[in-house]
């Protein structure tokens, strides 16, 4: 432990050395900023890959009739798009933000367990190399949807399913190690005076998210291992012929899957809770209630999983319980939304790019929440289930929710990361193009879904043609706009107006007390928090 509690003068010369030179700096790095950067670049590459798969889906659905891909390949695209976006884009992006920002926010010299931190990143290229390689195997890649329901993913799966299972194992191990690292850091490395109730909300949401990850990732590992056993080792967990039950798969999967969707949104809640007070130039309204609301959401996320299964045939008592439990999540979520709105109320608002994304987050995430309340109503869900209405719902919480939260965070902290201000005009252009493209892409899906257009089908009835064309145009617009974001980031790294230590007027917190760009080693001597 001596390295953690060293006196500041010990190895005085070592405290200001920069990174090693060359490629091995990145392979072997234990520096939280390097690892955060690796996560962020990796997640953006996966975002572009998963996004290009979505472009294939939308190109096929531009017109009715089978146009450009075979139905079998279409199913591989929907499956891989979901898996890559969830496990490859959204989650690693938030882990990257956690690695970069949590030590700076709590005054820690680095993350706890830095070598495990490095390993948890390097598992990801292996996992996704394995996953993407399945597309080139005989019989093709996973074609059973990102939820990989048995028996489609077991009895009737392509041969490549085994590689998919190992990819999920690797991604899960990575997530667990990242979460352990976050918890160890937050609980052990806070600066003197930084009590739990003084932590920035981003740190709080990540602490709770990390506990969620540790709780549910083993469940995911368990369910894919049961699949592996059914496929190769003669068990019958999910096969009725051998005394098993395909519905068991759904229960185990969604017991992981529902907390998982909260894992993807809670860090965004934390980031937005840092950004809105900054640009409203007043403290966050209801800090304590925000902490308790986050914890309530996390707790409730474990008791709602069967709302994904209303049409499977579960006892009506069960449907009632899961319906009411699901609706209950709207309460702490509503607390959060009203706190954000109240924070903006009578503030001295300015709308720089991070604030634009944060305000869009609040508005559009709320729309996604309302359609979620509709889906929670068990009798109504018989109409909505497996239609594009569900696709509209979860893309309204994932795109303006998770993705806009990531964009807002990136613009907010880019000056701290690079030492330069990004191009504000281009940032605003990126926002408006993303905002318009996203709404064009996903709003019409509510209509075609309510009219009965089923999900995951490469062809559709003529009556849905117009809205699908609008959706596809919006999707292409949203997709191409992300190349502009890449340009903005590279331009910001290469140069631009030098960023001060605190580039935003209303910003609070330890991360703004260090120079921009953040030095390679920070808080070697812990700061005092009053």
Segments from the language model and where they lie:
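Membrane-embedded and interfacial regions of multi-pass energy-transducing membrane proteins
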Residues: 2-530
């Amino acid at each position: 432990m001596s390295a953690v509690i060293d006196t500041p003068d010990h190895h005085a010369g070592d405290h200001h050395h920069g990174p090693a030179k060359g490629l091995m700096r990145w392979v072997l790095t234990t520096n939280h900023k390097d690892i955060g950067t690796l996560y962020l670049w990796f997640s953006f590459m996966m975002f572009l890959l998963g996004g290009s798969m979505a472009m294939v889906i939308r190109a096929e659905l531009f017109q009715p009739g089978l146009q450009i891909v075979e139905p079998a390949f279409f199913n591989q695209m929907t499956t891989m798009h979901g898996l890559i976006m969830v496990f490859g884009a959204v989650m690693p992006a938030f882990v990257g933000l956690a690695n970069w920002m949590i030590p700076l926010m709590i005054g820690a010299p680095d993350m706890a367990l830095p070598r495990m931190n490095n390993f948890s990143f390097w598992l990801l290229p292996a996992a996704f190399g394995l996953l993407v390689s399945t597309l080139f195997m005989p019989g093709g890649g996973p074609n059973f949807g990102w939820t990989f329901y048995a028996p489609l993913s077991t009895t009737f799966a392509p041969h490549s399913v085994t590689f998919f299972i190992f990819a999920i194992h690797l991604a899960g191990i990575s997530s667990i190690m990242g979460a352990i690292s976050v918890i160890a850091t937050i609980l052990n490395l806070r600066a003197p005076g930084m009590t739990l109730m003084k932590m920035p909300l981003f740190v709080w949401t990540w602490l709770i998210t990390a506990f969620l990850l540790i709780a549910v990732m083993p469940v995911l590992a368990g369910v894919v291992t049961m699949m592996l056993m059914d496929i190769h080792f003669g068990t019958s967990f999910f096969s009725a012929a051998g005394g098993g039950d395909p519905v068991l798969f759904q229960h185990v999967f969604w017991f992981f899957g529902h907390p998982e969707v909260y894992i993807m949104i809670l860090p965004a809640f934390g980031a937005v809770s840092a950004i809105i007070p900054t640009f409203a130039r007043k403290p966050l309204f209801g800090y304590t209630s925000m902490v308790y609301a986050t914890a309530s959401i996390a707790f409730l996320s474990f008791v709602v999983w069967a709302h994904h299964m209303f049409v499977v045939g579960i006892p009506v008592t069960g449907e009632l319980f899961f319906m009411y439990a699901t609706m209950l999540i709207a309460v702490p979520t509503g607390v959060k939304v009203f706190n954000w709105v109240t924070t903006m109320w009578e503030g001295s608002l300015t709308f720089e790019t991070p604030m634009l994304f944060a305000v869009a987050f609040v508005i559009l995430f709320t729309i996604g929440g309302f359609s979620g309340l509709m889906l929670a109503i068990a009798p109504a869900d018989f109409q909505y289930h497996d239609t594009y209405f569900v696709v509209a719902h979860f893309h309204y919480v994932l795109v303006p929710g998770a993705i806009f939260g990531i964009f807002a965070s990136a613009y907010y902290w880019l000056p701290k990361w690079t030492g330069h201000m990004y191009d504000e005009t281009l940032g605003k252009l990126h926002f408006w193009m993303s905002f318009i493209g996203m709404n064009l892409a996903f709003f019409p899906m509510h209509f075609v879904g309510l009219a009965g257009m089923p999900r995951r089908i490469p062809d559709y009835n003529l009556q849905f043609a117009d809205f699908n064309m609008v959706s596809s145009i919006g999707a292409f617009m949203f997709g191409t706009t992300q190349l502009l974001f890449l340009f903005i980031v590279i331009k910001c790294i290469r140069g631009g107006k030098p960023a001060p230590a605190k580039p935003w007027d209303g910003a609070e917190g330890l991360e703004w007390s260090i120079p921009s760009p953040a030095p390679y080693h920070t808080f070697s001597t812990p700061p005092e928090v009053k």
